[in-house]
From Swiss-Prot:
Signal sequence residues: 1-19
Designated name of the protein: Uncharacterized lipoprotein SE_0144
Bilayer topology annotation: Lipid-anchor
Species whose genome carries this gene: Staphylococcus epidermidis (strain ATCC 12228 / FDA PCI 1200)
Lipidation (N-palmitoyl cysteine): C20
NCBIfam families, alphabetized: SA_tandem_lipo
Gene3D superfamilies: 2.50.20.40
Source taxonomy: Bacteria, Bacillati, Bacillota, Bacilli, Bacillales
Stated family: Belongs to the staphylococcal tandem lipoprotein family.
């Protein structure tokens, strides 16, 4: 049931084939490093001046739109799964940013069929500040939204090249790829996540880098990272983050 729930959260499913060597791991790292080398970007307005990978999917005069997404998903033992996070569309053409803070709860009926209930709170960004665009009466929730920080604002992957012995998967038919690494609770990124979120486990996470599309670069597909603290039938705790550069869609 864990996988059904994750489909409803990601709205995508990767089909991976394991068994690749060090060369493929190096290619995957190189692909992700194009984005991860930008971390941290404390001022999100800097994205207005950042160029991303362009291909034939982009119109000639389209400067592109950055889509950033961070969320924490927690399913304690015996309780419902809840995801809380935010997505922003940073339009380089109009130099405007809008998005949503999203709370998603997933329950199961007596047959084990997941039921998804989500609530979206529209936001905009001005002067590097997140501003709700509709009235929010819940003061605690409003503060949570206004103070929200994306992982790209504090994460750091300068040591990515030193990550060793990853579990590598690659499927050239999709194409899709992934690399998984065991992390330590003493690592910088893990400490930053524990500082910002109430993570109800002392277990050190695994870092999963996964994506779809041409490893050499493509605007079709996506790259996505996940810190998995706990993953089993009764309990799931993980954090996800993504930054993708896409053609603008009339925003």
């Amino acid at each position: 049931m864990r996988y059904l729930k994750r489909i409803t959260i990601y709205i995508s499913l990767l089909i991976l084939v394991s068994g690749c060597g060090n060369n493929k791991e190096a290619e995957i790292k190189q692909n992700f490093n194009k984005t991860l080398s930008m971390y941290p970007i404390k001022n999100l307005e800097n994205f207005y001046d950042k160029e991303g990978f362009r291909d034939e999917e982009f119109d000639k005069d389209d400067k592109g739109t950055w889509i950033i997404n961070s969320k924490m998903i927690v399913e304690p033992k015996g309780k419902d799964m809840e995801a809380r996070g935010m997505v922003l569309h940073i339009n380089r053409n109009t130099r405007t940013t809008k998005g949503d803070f999203i709370i998603k709860r997933i329950t199961e009926d007596n047959k084990g069929i997941p039921d998804v209930k989500d609530k979206k709170y529209p936001v905009k960004m001005e002067n590097n500040k997140i501003i709700p665009t509709k009235q929010i009466k819940d003061k605690k929730l409003k503060k949570e939204i206004e103070n929200f920080k994306f992982f790209v604002q504090y994460g750091n992957f300068k040591n990515l090249k030193h990550y060793k012995d990853g579990e590598i998967s690659y499927n050239p038919n999709v194409p899709s790829y992934s690399a998984k690494y065991q992390l330590s609770n003493n690592g910088y990124n893990v400490k930053q996540l524990r500082k910002r979120y109430d993570i109800p486990t002392n277990q050190a996470p695994k870092l999963l880098l996964k994506g779809t599309g041409d490893l050499k670069g493509s605007s079709v597909g996506y790259n996505h990272l996940e810190f998995t603290f706990v993953e089993n039938k009764k309990e799931n705790i993980y954090f996800t983050d993504s930054i993708n550069f896409n053609p603008s869609r009339g925003d």
